[in-house]
Amino acid sequence: MFVLDPAAICCCAVTCCCGVGSVCAYRKRQSIPHPSECALIGKMYRLCGCHDHDKFDVLIEIHEIHDLTQSGKFFVEVHAGRSEERTGVCSAKKGRVEIQERVNIHVRQADKTLTVRVKKQGLTSTEAIGDAVIGVKSELIDGAFPKRQSFFCQKDGKTACKIVLSFHRLDTGNVSLGDFQMSPLLHQALLIAQSEAEARGETLQVDILNMTEVERLRFLSKVLEGPLKQMSSIGGAWKNLYFRAAERRNGKWEWQYWSSKDDCMSGIKKRGAYSFMAISLVLPDKHDRHCFYIRYHDTGGVHDLFFKRVDRDRNLWSDGLFEFIEKLREYLEKHPEVAMSGRGGHSSRREKKKEGDVGGSRTPRKRDGKALTPRTGASDDAGDDGIRGRSPRGSDRRALSHRSFVDPAELAEKRRVLSPRETAADEMTRPRASVLKGRMIEGLMYDRSLQPGEKNEEASEADERPRERTEGVEYEREEEQPLLFTQ
C-alpha cells in the first residue's frame, strides 16, 4: 500500500526540480561562464598550455553571400562562445546577397572556433542554409585577421553557399586615449591608421591625448572619405560620387565630392561641397539598411539629400557624420573667433576684382563717375547699399569682418539650432526617409543609370519647368558667401 508521507513528497519534488534544472542547464550550457573567464584562473590555463590564445574583441565585416540556390530574404548570425550577433535581413538578387554590415564579437580564450551561420527568413520561422566554422588560432590569429576572404558554408556535408568576411582587430598597445572614450568614429579612424601603418610595415602609434583639437579633427576626418551614391533630384536615379572631408581654411570644414576617386587623387577640381556647419540632421533609413538622409541648408533654402553606401556599412557614414559634426561644433563653440575669421575675413573673387589694391591701398575704384570713398557720404551710403544688396542675407560684410561685434551667446544659439542632435531631439516625429523621398520623386525609385531616351525626356521636362540653379552656380554662390549658419 502506497502512503503519501511528507518524506515521499519531498523526494518527488526534489527529483522533479533536479530534472527540470538539468534540462534548462543543458539548453543554456553555452551561457554558463567558463572558469578561465576569471583573470587569475585564465592565466593559469595559459601557463599550463591548456589555451593557445588570450581573450580579445574582433570586428567582423560581413560583405556578401554568393552562390545561393534559393531566393528570398537572408541574414547572418555569428557565434563565438557565449557571444552571439546577427545582421539585418537582406533580399537575394540572382543568387547574391549584399549585406555590408559590421558586428563586434568577444572571443574568450576558451573558444577555439567561430561559427558564421547563414539563415533564410521565412514568414513565421527561419531556415538554416549553412555554417562556416572558422578556427580562432589557425585561421584568424595565424592568418593575421584576413580581409575579404571567402568561406564555404556547409550543410549536411555539402557546400550551400560562400560568404565574404573581413576581420579587424585593433591593437591598442601603443594608443594613448587618456580621458577620451572609444566611439565608433574614433574606432574606425584608428582602424584606418592601423591599416596604413601595416602597409608601411610599422606598428600603430597614436597619441590622441596630446593632439590639439584641430589635429584630432583632421585625424577623425579620414572616416568620412570614400565612395557613395547620391540620389539625383531628377527621376530618383543614383549617381556615383567620391566624398572627402577637407579643411579649406581655419575653422572652415567641407564635405567635398568628386566624380570618382581618381579625380580626387589626381587633383582635379571638386564638383562641389557641403558645409558641415550647414547640416542640421543626419538620419539613417529605418526601412532601408543601405541608405541615410541629410538635411542641408544653403542660401536657396532647405534641401533633402539621400545617400546610399557602396563599400562599407551604412552606419559608419551616418554615425561618423553625426559625431564629426558634433565635435566640430564643440571646437567652434570653444573658439568662436576661429569661425568668424573664416567667415568675416573671407572676400569673394568678385569683390577682389572690384577693389583697387595699388601700392597697398584699398581705396575702391570709381563706379558711374563717383568714387566710393569714406570721405563722400552719399557715395559711401550707396556703396553700403550695394554690398548689402549683393549679400544673400542683406547684411553688411564689412560689419561682419569686425570680431568685436561677435556675440558668443548668439553664436552658440545659431549653432544649437543647426545641431543634428538638437534637431533630432526637438522634432516630435522624426521623418521617415521613405516619406522624404516622396517629396523629390513621384512613383517608384529605381537604382539604375538613365537611358539616352530617358535623358532626353527629362531634359525636355526640365526646360518646361522654371529654371533652377545648377550645381556649379550653387557652389559659386557658396564660395562668395561661406555659409556657416542658417537663421
From Swiss-Prot:
In the UniProt record for this chain, what is stated about the effect of gene disruption? No defect in tachyzoite growth, intracellular replication and host cell invasion.
Q: List the InterPro entries hit by this protein, alphabetically.
A: PH_CERLI1
Membrane association type: Peripheral membrane protein
Which intervals carry biased composition (Basic and acidic residues)? 385-399, 454-475
> Where do the segments described as Disordered lie?
337-487
| Subcellular location field | Cytoplasmic vesicle, Secretory vesicle, Rhoptry membrane
Q: Which Pfam families match?
A: PH_CERLI1 (PF23634)
The primary location reported for this protein is: membrane
GO terms for cellular component: cytoplasmic vesicle; rhoptry membrane
Which cysteine pairs are joined by S-S bonds? none
Q: Which UniProt keywords apply?
A: Cytoplasmic vesicle, Membrane
User: This protein's superkingdom?
Assistant: Eukaryota
Quaternary structure?
Answer: Interacts with RASP2.
What is the name listed in the Swiss-Prot or TrEMBL entry for this protein? Rhoptry apical surface protein 1
